[in-house]
Amino acid sequence: MTNIRKSXPLMKIINSSFIDLPAPSNISSWWNFGSLLGICLALQILTGLFLAMHYTSDTATAFNSVTHICRDVNYGWVLRYLHANGASMFFICLYLHVGRGIYYGSYMYTETWNVGVILLFAVMATAFMGYVLPWGQMSFWGATVITNLLSAIPYIGTNLVKWIWGGFSVDKATLTRFFAFHFLLPFVISAMVMVHLLFLHETGSNNPTGIPSNMDMIPFHPYYTIKDILGLLLMITVLLMLVLFSPDMLGDPDNYMPANPLNTPPHIKPEWYFLFAYAILRSIPNKLGGVLALVLSILILIIIPLLHTSKQRSMTFRPLSQCLFWLLVADLFTLTWIGGQPVEHPYVIIGQLASILYFSIIXILMPXISFAENHLLKW
């Protein structure tokens, strides 16, 4: 008799995706983050669903409804902090996942990579709208500043901003629509994840050497299911330590003050995971230029496959490219730090230099060094 997992139509899909999937025998822990991201997404949807049962998307009651969740709902505080810190874990895994893709040349699977970049944009949009929902000071002013950037778009900008606001400022209509989109987008993201996996399973996984591993494959289960469970346990441990010991460590104290349009906070800044892009935005004195740089800081990922000049796919055997990659990582940490600092000397000039370096490494230095390494191979 045929095994049910190989005959039932639904089980066949699950079997070919998670059980009998041929996987390279040498993929390292850097390949764990895909499954961790899937778990993060499931966690966010679940906690978000339960939070939405108690939340009200009205300017008069939003802040109080979040307070009510924390004080009066059974384990509401756990739900709220799991959701808030779950977003941080989501972005940590996302950035490590993208970093792995750049280091090991996974971007050569262009369809998978491009869907991944669109996913990154979708997750960033969802997180931004979620930050507005508690209707604290930083929620209100963050929404005002970031949506106002769209007014830099020539000709249609001002009308576009009013259309997004649903009025002449961030108000009741804005909060309601942000809640609607924040609820909807994770399900769109889930569908896009399926497309991401569909494209990935067309080619199979890359591996640390960057050499095709068709000769040496092993089944996904039990080898990588066990490995993924270990990664999951480590991530859940870090998340629970955050939630139970210092739930507000990554948040902004200003968000514990109800939104007040008459009182601007001294330093308006987004959540930590957007600080690098915020620093790039602020480092350009021109509004439209800043907005373009902000969008390009993520959109530049799309052209990375076109900039690949090396004869080798992975950076495993390319020490010069490795140096550049880690310089890029250090640069992103610098930008994240600058994004959280006030706009004054010396932070402005450091931010500008770090922004120039960011675009230079990706667009100029990496292709050139890869080209040079090709010639070094002949020595």
Curated annotation (Swiss-Prot):
Bilayer topology: Multi-pass membrane protein
GO biological process, one term: mitochondrial electron transport, ubiquinol to cytochrome c
Lineage top rank: taxon: Eukaryota
Amino-acid positions noted as binding heme b b566 in the UniProt annotation, renumbered to this chain: 97, 196
One Gene Ontology cellular component annotation held by this UniProt entry: respiratory chain complex III
Positions of heme b b562 binding: 83, 182
Pfam families, per the entry: Cytochrom_B_C, Cytochrome_B
InterPro entries: Cyt_b/b6_C (IPR005798), Cyt_b/b6_C_sf (IPR036150), Cyt_b/b6_N (IPR005797), Cytb/b6-like_sf (IPR027387), Cytochrome_b (IPR030689), Cytochrome_b_C_euk/bac (IPR048260), Cytochrome_b_N_euk/bac (IPR048259), Di-haem_cyt_TM (IPR016174)
A single GO molecular function term of this UniProt record: metal ion binding
Cofactor: heme b
Compartmental location: Mitochondrion inner membrane
Residues that coordinate or bind a ubiquinone: 201
Signal sequence annotation: none
Keywords, comma-separated and alphabetical: Electron transport, Heme, Iron, Membrane, Metal-binding, Mitochondrion, Mitochondrion inner membrane, Respiratory chain, Transmembrane, Transmembrane helix, Transport, Ubiquinone
Cofactor note: Binds 2 heme b groups non-covalently.
Sequence intervals crossing the membrane: 33-53, 77-98, 113-133, 178-198, 226-246, 288-308, 320-340, 347-367
Remarks, miscellaneous: Heme 1 (or BL or b562) is low-potential and absorbs at about 562 nm, and heme 2 (or BH or b566) is high-potential and absorbs at about 566 nm.
Family listed: Belongs to the cytochrome b family.
Subunit structure of this chain's protein: The cytochrome bc1 complex contains 11 subunits: 3 respiratory subunits (MT-CYB, CYC1 and UQCRFS1), 2 core proteins (UQCRC1 and UQCRC2) and 6 low-molecular weight proteins (UQCRH/QCR6, UQCRB/QCR7, UQCRQ/QCR8, UQCR10/QCR9, UQCR11/QCR10 and a cleavage product of UQCRFS1). This cytochrome bc1 complex then forms a dimer.
Function per UniProt: Component of the ubiquinol-cytochrome c reductase complex (complex III or cytochrome b-c1 complex) that is part of the mitochondrial respiratory chain. The b-c1 complex mediates electron transfer from ubiquinol to cytochrome c. Contributes to the generation of a proton gradient across the mitochondrial membrane that is then used for ATP synthesis.
Protein name from the UniProt record: Cytochrome b
Organism: Myotis oxygnathus (Lesser mouse-eared bat)
